[in-house]
Each structure stands twice: as C-alpha cells, then as structure tokens.
Amino acid sequence: MNQYHIYEAIGHGKCSTVYKGRKKKTIEYFACKSVDKSRKNKVLQEVRILHSLNHPNVLKFYAWYETSAHMWLVLEYCVGGDLRTLLQQDCKLPEESIYGLAYDLVIALQYLHSKGIIYCDLKPSNILLDENGHIKLCDFGLSRKLDDISKSPSTGKRGTPYYMAPELYEDGGIHSFASDLWALGCVLYECYTGRPPFVAREFTQLVKSIHSDPTPPLPGNASRSFVNLIESLLIKDPAQRIQWADLCGHAFWKSKINLVQLPTQPAFDDMIGINTKPCLSERNGDRPNKTPPKYREKDRKGGSKQNENSIQGSKGHETPIKGTPGGSKAQAKLPSRATEEKHGGRPAANRQVNILRLSRIAKANLQKENEKENYRRPLPNSNENCAEVKIDNTDMELDFDENNDDEGPDESEGTENTSCAQEERVMSHNENHRRQRVVSSNVPDENSSANETPTLGEARDCHEDQSEPMDMSAAPPSASPQLKTHRGRETSGVAVNHDSSKAPTSLTDVFWHISDLSVRPVMPSRKSDKEAVHSLSFETPQPSDFSKKGKQELEPLNNRIITVLSGSSSGLSEKQNLIRYLETLSTNADAANILTNGPIMLVLVKVLRLSKTPAFRVQIASLIGLLIRHSTSIEDDLANSGILDSLTNGLRDKHEKVRRFSMAALGELLFYISTQNEHKDFKPPESPSKETRSASGWQVSNALISLVSSVLRKGEDDLTQVYALRTIENICSQGAYWATRFSSQDLISNLCYIYKATGKQESMRQTAGSCLVRLARFNPPCIQTVVEKLSLKEIASSFVKGSAREQQVCLNLLNMAMIGSHTFTSFGRHLVTLTEEKNLFPSLLSIIEQGTEVLRGKALLFVAFLCKNSRRWLTNFFCNARFLPVVDRLAKEKDSYLQQCLEAFVNVIASIIPGMLDTITNDIQQLMTGRRHGPVSPLNSRAPVKTNAHLFPVVLHLLGSSSFKNKMVTPQVLRQLANLTKLVEASFQGRDDFRVTLLQVLECITGDAPLVTQNGEIIIREILPSLAAIYNGNKDGDARFLCLKIWFDSLTILLTECTEIEQQISEDLKSISNSHFLPLYPALIQDEDPIPAYAQKLLVMLVEFDYIKISNLLRHNTVSQCFEFLLGDLSSANVNNVKLCLALASAPEMESKLLSQLKVVRRIGNLLEFVNAKDMEDFLEPTLSLCRAFLLRSLGNKKGLSSNYTKEPTLLSEASFTFEVDPQECIRDIADFGSNIGLFLHFAGLDDDTSIAVADIASECVVLLLKAASREATTGFLTNLPKITPILDSWRRRKSTELHLLVLKRVLHCLGYACKQYLSQAMILSISGHDVSKINAIVSEMKNSDAAGLNSIASLVAMELQRLPR
C-alpha cells in the first residue's frame, strides 16, 4: 500500500473503512478499502468474484494487499457517492431520473446472472454513482455463485431484511435470480417514493408485512408501464415473479435490452418443485398437514388467520378451519391466484415462515457479537422481548445462520485474526456507520466430546453456543445468556460513555476506551451431541421445554439424572451420554440457571471430587464450566458445596486434560464471583497476605489466587495457560480489588515472559499483554515492574510488528508508562531507548492515518505523552510533512472517542509551546552573552541538548494546522514572540535562519483575522515596532518582505474588518504609522519587488483612514517618488500608485506649485489612454479622479475651491467661476489634457448603472477643462461632436436618474459654452453640418422636457447652435 497516498475516509463499515487514495506520481484516484483481518475469508470471497467481473456498471477491482493488521482492496473511485445518500438528500426521484438508474441496474444484474453470480445484497447503499450519473454495483461480500448454492443451499442466509425476498425467510428458501429481481423492485420503489415498499421498526413485523401485505400502490402520476414493472418485480411467489425474458422486453424500456444466455438454477428449481408437491409436512410442533393448501382463508373482517409466530402459504383446504363459519372449505370464495399475485399479494405455494425463530437467530447472532466485548456485562433494555430485533435503519444487515455458533476463531485467538470489536461500540448499531454488518465468515464445526483431546483451536471457540435443535416457534426462552443487572462494578478510570459535549481536561480523561475492558468466556463452547440424547433410557425434554417446567415437574427428571450420575449401576457410557445431554441443556440460559442452582450441580461437584476416571472427570469439569458460563445468576448456596475445592483439586491433577477443563471451569466461576463487586470502595490491605473476607458466601483465598497464577509458569500446558490468562484478564477488569490481589511479582514476570515468548501463539501473547494492561491500570505501581521486565523498546517493537489488538495493548502499556514516569528513578533512560526503534514513527503515522478509531485515538495520546516527556520528539512528528495533514483530517471523523482524544492531544501540544518558547528565549539570551554555543545534539543522543532553538520550526508547522492554530496563539505566546523579535535585532549564532522562521510564524498569525482582532493591542504595541527595526539594514530580501507583509496583513485586518477600534489602540496605530512606517517609506518604495507595491497600498490605506496626514507625508519629501511611476513603463503601474497620487493632489496641504513643477499632466493623459486601451476597470475611476484633482487645482487656490465650487454646471451662467484664480497655484501644463477630451466624452457616454459614476467624473472633467484651458478644450470638444450625439440621445433611450440628468446638463453646458468660445475667439475649425443638425434635433426635443432644469438649458444651447455657421 506504500504505492498510494491515502486521503480522507469516504465511507465506513462495521469492520472496514474506505479512503480516497491516489497512486503516487500519478493523477489516478482510487477507493482504498481497509478491512479488518478478521474478515479475511469474506474479503477473499469478494476478491474472487470481483476479479472475474468486467462491466461498466460493476465497480472495477484493481488489486488487493495484505498488511499486518488489514486487508486492502484497491477499487474504482466514484465521485457521485451512493444512492442511499442521494435519496437521503432528495427524498425521492422523478420517474425520468429513475429510468436511467433502472436501465443500468437491469443491465448490471443480467450481466452478473449470466456469469452465474447472485448478487444477494442489492440495496441503495451498494449502488454507487460515477461523475456521469451511471451506476456501479459494489460490495460483493454476500454474493454467491450458483454452483455454491447448489452444493450448500442452506448456507448464506444473510442480508438486509428490507430488501430480502419473501422466499428467503422461508424454510428451504434460497437466493436466486428471482430474489435479486425482488430487491430490484424494492430499490426502484424506494427511488420513487423515498422509502422501501414494506417498512417496520421490528423484524417480526417487517417479515409479516413482506410475506403477507399487498404491495402499497405508487403515489402520484406514475406511468402505467412503470407501475406494472414494480408490481411484476414485487410478486411474492418467486415462481410467478417476472423473469428475465419478460423483464428485458417490458414496455417500460424505451430502448431494447438484449436478453443474454443465462445458466440454469437447479437449486431454485428444486425449491420450486418442493413447494408445489401435493403433500407437505409442516414443522410446527411436529404436526403434519394432511393436505396441500392453496390459499389462506380470510376471517369475517377479511384478515388472514395465522399463527402469531409463523406465516404459512395457507391452511389445509380439505380440513375445516377454525374461525371459518360453519367450518366450510376455504377456497370456494377466494379470489383467483392470478388476481392476488397481480397485486403483489400472497404466495400461492405452501410455504412456512417461522418468524419468531428467525428473529431469535438474528438476535442471538447480534448478541454473540456483543459478547465478545461485553460478556457478563449488563446490557440495556434487558426486559424487552428477548426475541425481537429492533431495526434501526433500512440498511441494517442481519445474519440468519442458525449454525453460526462457533463461526470462527475467537477474536483474540486466531493466528491471523485481529479484534474487529475494537473498532465498535457496545453493539448499539452505531448510526455513524453506513453499514451495520453483523456477520462473519463461517468455518466448519465438528462435534467433540470432553474425553477427546482438544486442540488449541477448540480453546478458541468461546462464542455462545446456540446450536440447540429445538423448535423455536415455541414460547421464547432466552436466546443467549444475559445477566441480571449486577451491582455496578468499580469503574475507576473507565471512559465508557464518550460524551462529545463534555470537553476532556487532560490526557487521562480519555485514556481508556470500553474495549480496554472487554471480557470473553473462559470456557470453550461444546457442540451438542444429538445422538447421545436419543440413547438415554428416560424422556429428555428440549432445553426450551426444560426451562418452562416447574420445580415439581422437574423433580422426577432430576432424580433420574442424579441416579445415573451417582449410581454405581450406571455404566460409564450412560453417564457420558447424560453429560452430553446436560451440555445441550446448558446452552439455554434459563435451563443453565435451574441446573446450576439445583441439586444436579451439587452431585456434579461431588462426582468430580470422587471420580477416579480421568476421561469422566474431564467431562464433568467441562459440564460444570459450561453451566457456570451460561448461568446468569448463581446462588450463594453453591459456595458451600465445595465447588471451589473440587475445581482446585482438578487443577492440581496429574492429567493434563483434567487440569485444562478444571482451569476453564474455575475461571468461569472466579469471574462470576468477581462480578458480584462487593469491594467498590476497596483500599489495598496493609499486608498483601492478609485475607479480605467477602460479604457473600464466596471466599476466594490467596492460596487459590496463587494457584491460578502459578499455572502461567514456564512448562505448563499451553491450553491450560490460555484458560488461566482469560481468567486473569476477565477478573482484573473488575477493578482495583481483584487487580491488587493478582499483582504479584511472580505473576507479572510470568506474564511478561509469555508476552515476549516467540514460541507462543500470537493470541496467547496478546491476552498476556491485556492482563498486564489491566493489572497496571487498577494497580498503577505495577507499571514500573512491567517496564523493568519488558523494556519500552520491546513494547514499541511489538507495536510496530503486531496486529491491531496487540497494537492496542502496546499503546496502553506505553501510555501507562508515560503517565507513571514520575515513579521511575530515571525514566529518561527508558525513554531514550524508543529512539532506537526506527519504525516507531512510520507505524504511528500509519495508525493515525488508517487505523481503527480506538487505535487512532490512543496513538495520538502516545504522541502527546512522548512530546510532553521529551521535547526532542516534537520535531520528529510536527516537522514531518505528512503528520499534521493527517491530524487535520481526523477533525472530520464522527467517532466521539477519537474526537475527544484529538482535542486532548491538541490541548497538550498547545500547552507545551509556552514553556518551549521560554526555554528558547533563555537559550538565545545565553548565546548572545557567549555563555552557550549553538550546535544541537541529535535526537538519539544521550548527551544533554545544548540549545533548543532547533525546536522553533515546530511552532511554524503547528500554525499551519487548522487543528492547532487557534489553540496555540494566546496573548502569552504572542508576548513571547514579541520578545523574540526584540532579541533578533541583535546578533548571535544562527540568528538569520531563526529570524526568518520567526517572521514566517508571525506571518501565519497575522494572516488570520480573528487572531489579529483579538490580539490587536499586542501586535501594534509590541510586534510591529520591532519589525520596523528588523527591516532597517537587513540584507535578506525575504526577511525585509516578511516584515512589511506582517505590517500590511495586520493593519489591513484591523482597518477593514474591525467595526470599532478602541480609542487607545487607534492612537497607538496612528503613532506607529507615523513614527515607524512613514520613515521607512522612501526605502520601501526603492526596494525590490513586490515590496514597493505592498508599501504603496499600505500607505494609501493609512491615508484613507486618516492615520497618516498628507502633511506628515510631505515632510518626508516623498511627493516626487509617488509620481515617478508616470515617467516609466505604465504597464508596471499599480492602482495604488494612482490612489496615492490622487490623495496627494486632493489634499489641501499639498502645494499646487509642487504639482505644477512635476509636469506630469501629459503623462496622466497617457495613463488614461493606456487604461482605456487595456480595459483596466479598477484603474479607471482613480485615474479620472486624478485628472479632476489636477483640473480643480488649475482653477484657483485651495480655499476658493472648497468654498465656491459646485458640481452643478454653470458655464452658461453669468456668474460662472467668479472666484479669483491665483496664477501661482495653477497647473501650468493643464492644457495638455485638451488632447484627452475625446476620452473624457467617451467615458461620459457610459450610461449604464455600473458606469454612471465614471460618467459623472468624466463629464465634470470636461466642464473643468473648458474653463481651465478654453481654447484647447473647445477645439477638442467641437472636433468630437460624433461622441456627443449618443450622450444626448441617451435622454430618449432611458429613464433619467438624478446623476444621469447631471451628466446631460454638463454636456449641454459644455456644448453651448464651446459654441460661444468658437464664435468669440473666431476659431477656424471644420465642423460637420450633419453632426450639428443631429445634435440640434435632439436639443430641440429637450426643450419640451419636463425634467427639472433641462428644458431651460436646452433652449440656451439651441440658440448657440443656431449661431454656428453652416
């Protein structure tokens, strides 16, 4: 998988996560599916099927890989997501949109069927969409080949109930073409209506609805062909359901679907044949049906009469049926078969559905998953109907395999398995997961008896045994053992409920996850021997019947059992058969309670003590263990039976198998005793040897504890040690009392030896590690002993190489060592050994990126502990380019435990920074005084680090992370950085590199608006002045640019984004702008690009917001510099140049004489032409405003302008421009604008709403120019009469606004004034008579205008036009 870059998670399953990935050095994207290795068989099955498929509507499979903890599938990446998400967003789709989906689905299904593959899991979440909206079928984990179905039709009863066909709930029902087509009908129905056709929150109600209720009609105006298609797909009888030939030729399809050759379905044909035989037997209490039914009878209300716990195709039609008036035959008045099936009614053939049995099987399989983590842990809602399954969502998948008892190795015992349970919560059908798969791969089960030699694989079989051959249609006994709610055990340090609303305060608040205390049965499951039951000489009720019998009813049976067990007349064979029968009873919780708390258990204890036959003692010990395992309550009376002594003696037996099963049974009993939690407020005894008396009848001596612990000594049988390890693991999960009793030096040494032993199976080593974790958790001083026996380097090495479960154990041990570091005499000696494990960092990064939620969270905590204990680790993690992006992506995860770990991690790392900055500051001060030199020791060196300045880049990297930035930047940190900016003004070894990093850090901070606004006072008073000092005399261009950019970013945010600036901050801002920035401006403007552009923009902003006065600017002789850009290449000009010149030209403090001396009017006109030619819209208004400012200055002194000038045109009035003009204040080269009057008129003609402001300024410039340079302006104006016509004509085209009218009035005034000047100065110009006539016509119309003032001006202009020579 190191060929791929792994990005964010795009989908989640129960034991899988799908990531977006990219192949390295390419732009090819893939979906990389990571599956827990415990699902290896299922993954390989999916790979085999995907490898054989190649179709545009089937998800492409590229490769698969196996890593130490996961299986990886590299699949096609579909950007459109899945259909389920689409329906959640849009609720439902129109028929025309469904058509394309349906067409692709039919093509894809037909392709699969042509390859002999039944999909078995068609539902919206398995239908992906590509960028073009075409569908892709995915997830073939449940798919089956026709050949496999023919060989074993009864297996594979798994699926999503909402989309399963009715026949799949029936005895003998199998997957087929027909069941896939039913699912297709459900999907299309859901696309149109927004919900599946049959909906219920409880499994039993859902199955009844699917099997009995007619298909709900489609709402709205669905086409007849679409309605017919849905009805044909949702016919309940698979034999009558639409088939491929009819489906391909259906009227719904606009383009033809070609029918391909399909393989035969022998198993399906057999199922149909069986269901149509003339006589069937019904298994409902083993009562035969004499006649084959055709239809179900309706009662008087029209409802069908049926057993609550089973649904049948019909009742016998030749036998009078209860509830039928007069007992008449049922079929006479019923509708025809075709009529019912047309409406998706009931199946015609005789089929039986035992709903309660199916529900109980599904519930049992769900509980088995739960028990892997929650054995003997009370579960919520325990008083609800134990056979009912709540269906949380339409995508929930259930397992209906009754033989799923020992479906594979225990999650801790498989040589290749890893604990899928570690990434799950307490079986609450986690709604954050898209898939809720509760199935796992099956392995063949073999019957075994206790006197056969068990293999280590048998010891792994620790799931609940639910294979009893009972009729589940009877009243429901407990489907699997569930404890009564015991008094809550000690929960010190247990993070069970990860409430994301409560923020963690420290790492220890989120240290533990519920999976850290997962417990499992010690006793392996035993397969019931059905033959043994039949060979007994007395009646043997089924477990469900046994549990219903009263005490008096059971007494004769108990006496017979006791007689056989204790009587000398009974042969060994009969006793062994009886034991096998009792094993069958033990799998029922109610029956196990009766046997455990009754006389039979007392006899079993006695027989175990007295029997001399090893094989029989093995069976007795096994039976005792099974009874205790499955019992939910054990009375204290059993404590007086000597059961502990008997099992203890068995543990001392010389026969290996007796010791094995005695240990397993003793382990179950000790664990039960530990759950009675009477040591809630336990405090360790003064002496470890001091006995602690229990309030209950159970007394567990220290000698017994020592005996169990001694089993782990070197040389003992591996299986016996497995049972002892499970015992210790389970008991130590119950709190400090029990953990302290087991915390002996010898036990810890033995556990460490087993954990390190290379010859032991991985699962055994993991259990030993789990025991060490629990001992150290509830008895913290133990961790020091563990680390002395098991070095941190060895634990880290196991973490690198181990499976997911071992990695969780290693992380817990490492984290506890970090927490207890203060108890070690020299923890640094231990910690430095971790640096020798070169693969530690890559493994941690891989876990944080791709591991389960629990492992990710714990890995983050470990990184935090490492960095907290030694700052050397900071650079390893946070200066790595991959680490922080991975951490940032975790913020998108929904898992509450992971989010709390992430928050605690961020808080801890952020809390390290202030102390680190203080240390760096002290080191630099010592470097400056010569008391310390700069070289840095490497990470793996044992020598003390000479300086910490090399850690400073960590701050920069953290600021680039969205997770850390806001947590890190506090007033304290900012003041520390401000202090460092003062220090770097002086010289010291390594200063230049450190200074650039410091400036980059400040740049990151000042680029964030909230941080700047919250800390404006510190930035303005303490940081910005120091930056001005750093700029001065700095030879590094990058450093100089960063200084200015920090100024620019900070002030831009403060000036533009702060609604109100405090008065004191405003005064400070004004002060530093004039005292620090303005003196630098001449140097800034001469610096290398892009520094001048930033400096100009900042200066303009400060001038506009009145923080810098023009008078202050003038003192620094910067005027000529500001206008220099006009003399150079105009293409290099920026808008801030123009704005700055505009500010200067508009300021009253500016002397016109200075502007006149610059002689830049012609260059300003050239700039206007350049702006127009290049269509530079952002330059247009400032450039025109600059022209206007120069024109205004040319007309008189500054005071006169402000008091007498008005925007209303007065050129034709008697009193126009009556104020005095000071020749010294005029712009001498103002007449150069005369060549630009055509441009002014062009811009004045822009009359759309977005350009009216430009037209306003341009028309004003024309008015001012005619007065300032009358002759030149008149010449330009009259030679551009064609440009005047459209301006005046706009009066006709649009409704005039106030500003538009002002522009028209100005142009009319200019026209009249120019005519006057032409005549008065006897100018010789060639004027087009045609243009004059057109203008005259428009002006004549304006004389009749009702717009205010326009008609009077038009009259005056008309008179002047008449005077022009023709």
Curated annotation (Swiss-Prot):
Basic and acidic residues composition bias: residue spans: 283-302, 367-376, 422-433
**EC number from the UniProt entry:** 2.7.11.1
> Which residue stretches belong to region Disordered?
276-356, 367-386, 398-502, 524-549
Functional description taken from the UniProt entry: Essential protein that regulates phragmoplast microtubule organization during cell plate expansion in cytokinesis during cell division, both somatic and syncytial. Required for endosperm cellularisation. In pollen development, involved in cellularisation during microsporogenesis by regulating radial microtubules (MT) organization in microspore mother cells. Seems to not have kinase activity.
What upregulates or represses it?
Cell-cycle-regulated.
- Bias class Polar residues marks the residues at 304-313, 438-454
| Tissue spec | Expressed in proliferating tissues of seedlings, lateral roots, young rosette leaves, siliques, flowers, embryos and stems (including apical meristem).
Binding residues for ATP:
10-18, 33
Q: Which UniProt keywords apply?
A: ATP-binding, Cell cycle, Cell division, Cytoplasm, Cytoskeleton, Kinase, Microtubule, Nucleotide-binding, Repeat, Serine/threonine-protein kinase, Transferase
Q: Could you state one GO biological process linked to this protein?
A: phragmoplast assembly
Tell me what this protein is called.
Serine/threonine-protein kinase RUNKEL
